[in-house]
Amino acid sequence: MVVHNGTAVTPRPAIGKVLLLAAASVGRGESIDFDNATVGAVPPGWMVAMTHTGGAPRWEVLKDDSAPSKPNVLAQVSTDRTAGRFPLAIWNRASLKDGTVTVKFKAVSGTVDQGAGLVWRYRDPNNYYIVRANALEGNVVLYKVQNGERVSLAPKGAVSNTYGVKHRVPKQTWSTLSVGFHGNLFTVSLDNQKLFDVEDSTFTGAGKTGLWTKSDSVIYFDDFQVVEQAGK
């Protein structure tokens, strides 16, 4: 399903591959590599949406020779330059309260922004958490989007107006972004290096997970993994 300005559109059917994961310490999860999905289509199980207005997002499966798991990736390819426009691809087949979400991403282009993000506890296009790595700004920031307003949340132990952390995010190179969310505590990692924690209690219930970009960011994603915390 595609949701744009309140209108739902059913994408072309596609065949995807979902690997089921199981581990006693973390619970059950899924890993999605898009390699059996139809090129040019939105993969099955994914819902396209957008926060704020602007040109419609364009999420589609592409072939990429550099993909961590070849041959396919999921890409947001629209280059609409509306600054406050946040394209979303939501994994529509699972909802969880506590767990970990991980994705590999490559910042391909964008003059306004080159932000690649993970979404969790998603309720609707105007209410969710998101952490994004920005290859133009060279930082990683965690936000809440509440009633359509995006607010940055300072790292634990930092002053209240601290804007994430400065960190090199390479362009045209694959990186791995991860967030663990357990109760009110969120832990952000980039390339297997812990960057910071955030505490917040705005959204405490279960919600969906997914992917996020901003404005004209063209971002490739691969190996999306979501693991639910055991016992939740």
Predicted regions located by residue number:
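Extracellular glycan-recognition surfaces and repeat-rich motifs
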Residues: 41-75, 82-85
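Localized edge beta-strand/strand-to-loop motifs within extracellular or lumenal beta-rich domains
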Residues: 173-187
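Short, solvent-exposed beta-strand-to-loop segments that form ligand-recognition rims
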Residues: 184, 189-208
